Amino acid sequence: MKLPGNRDKKIIDGTHRIVFYLLPLLGLAFLLWYIKNAACDVVYSDYIRLVNSYLPDVFNPEKFFVADVLTRIPINYLSRIINVKFFGFSITFDRVLGAVSVSLAAWCFAAYSRQLKINIKWFITFMIVMFSLNKWEMLTNGSGWSHFFAFACFYYHQILFDRYYRGQERKWDKTILMLLPWLIILGTAG
């Protein structure tokens, strides 16, 4: 017996389409509100080590090539330079990057859910998990934003791979599929 679902529909109606676009944006707004109200821009925990190691000279590559896994991630090095030069080293900058990265991952889930015509109730459940309490804790801790960004990149890679596998690839999908793993692994995973 076959159960009816959204996959049987040829077109997702307008209300569902809006929900797929709106929930990741609402999640971002919620995370930014949470960061504003639950944390202050003060150096603590992981950041004490980062401040002592990097702030005197953020352009020094010798400080980048050390044994610490969090500091060897190239995207962290780049964001730290931007943070120091434009914001005078603000912890909130890293937290906002984390919120944006979680929302990018949620957007990838939304795109994949639209592509597969996932039932809207399941999509809402995915979004609840995506913006759940474990993300809030990691956001206020701060330095884990690059991990959220890596998740978003991996999810995007899965979307492209699935599209290619089903024979629905777009013009640049094959090229991006060949380059993206290198960029993800070397840029966001160290």
How does the language model describe each region?
Residues 136-156:
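Multi-pass, polyprenyl lipid-linked donor-dependent membrane glycosyltransferases
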Residues 1-31:
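Start-transfer (signal-anchor) and selected internal transmembrane alpha helices
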Residues 96-122, 156-160:
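Transmembrane-helix motifs of polytopic, lipid-linked glycan transferases
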Residues 173-190:
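Membrane-interface alpha helices of multi-pass inner-membrane proteins
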Residues 154-177:
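Membrane-interface transmembrane helices that cradle and orient dolichyl/undecaprenyl
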Residues 65-89:
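Short hydrophobic/aromatic helix or loop-helix immediately within or flanking a transmembrane segment
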Residues 30-51:
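Helix-to-loop transition at the C-terminal end of transmembrane segments
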Residues 113-133, 151-152:
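Transmembrane-helix signature of polytopic, membrane-embedded enzymes
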